[in-house]
């Protein structure tokens, strides 16, 4: 029997919750430009499973999980900070 690898976690903000039980989470990271070596902010978007709890603007922690659909491989583990405006 093989051991599974360690589960990855990412922290990002919810940018869309228009789907049922799915949110889109934007995760920012810094990466150097390949030629000029200036640090540039980049954004990746992940579809994550959510049981109708998150609102747009919430800061959440997402964790890797088994494939739930064609695009969903992440689930919301916890809501770190609620959006005050919503």
Curated annotation (Swiss-Prot):
Signal peptide range: none
Outline the subunit composition: Part of the 30S ribosomal subunit.
**Family of this protein:** Belongs to the universal ribosomal protein uS17 family.
Name of the molecule in the record = Small ribosomal subunit protein uS17
A GO CC term assigned to this protein in UniProt: cytosolic small ribosomal subunit
* MF terms (GO), sorted A to Z: rRNA binding; structural constituent of ribosome
Q: Which InterPro entries match?
A: NA-bd_OB-fold (IPR012340), Ribosomal_uS17 (IPR000266), Ribosomal_uS17_bact/chlr (IPR019984), Ribosomal_uS17_CS (IPR019979)
Q: Which SUPFAM superfamilies match?
A: Nucleic acid-binding proteins
Protein task: One of the primary rRNA binding proteins, it binds specifically to the 5'-end of 16S ribosomal RNA.
Q: Which UniProt keywords are present, listed alphabetically?
A: Ribonucleoprotein, Ribosomal protein, RNA-binding, rRNA-binding
* An individual GO BP term: translation
């Amino acid at each position: 029997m093989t051991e599974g690898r360690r589960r990855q976690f990412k922290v990002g903000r919810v940018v869309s919750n228009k789907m049922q039980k799915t949110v889109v989470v934007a995760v920012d990271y810094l990466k150097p430009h390949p030629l000029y070596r200036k640090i540039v902010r980049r954004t990746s978007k992940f579809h994550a499973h959510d049981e109708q709890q998150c609102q747009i603007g919430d800061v959440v922690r997402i964790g890797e999980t088994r494939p739930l659909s064609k695009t969903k491989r992440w689930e919301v583990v916890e809501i770190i900070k609620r959006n005050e405006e919503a």
